[in-house]
Amino acid sequence: MRLLIAAVLVLLTLGGCSHKVTVGDLEGFEITVSTQNDVLRKVGEPNKKLDAGDFIVYAYKIDGEEYVLNFVNTPDGYRFLKTSKLTDEFRNFLKEKYENLTEEPFPLAWQ
């Protein structure tokens, strides 16, 4: 029984409860310096990901609103570009850019 309790405690400690991502967390990255790995280490996996080759966008849902982190492809890999709220205007911009670059329909999850 003690072994079972110890195993559960270890799992809770190592797996832990993830902290809630805040807008402040998303705004704390350095432009053209922070990498995708930096972002994933700090705030975890995004709710959605859009990969168009030249750019990648991660979406995080915070308090019922979506915020996106934009990455641009550089010779050194993808680098953080900016954080913004996902508005209809920005979603339409992403749709147009994605469809032009990939010649594929905009993913339903992003519409």
Where do the language-model regions lie?
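C-terminal motif of bacterial Sec signal peptides marking the signal peptidase cleavage site
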Residues: 13-16
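Residues within mature, well-folded domains
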Residues: 18-111
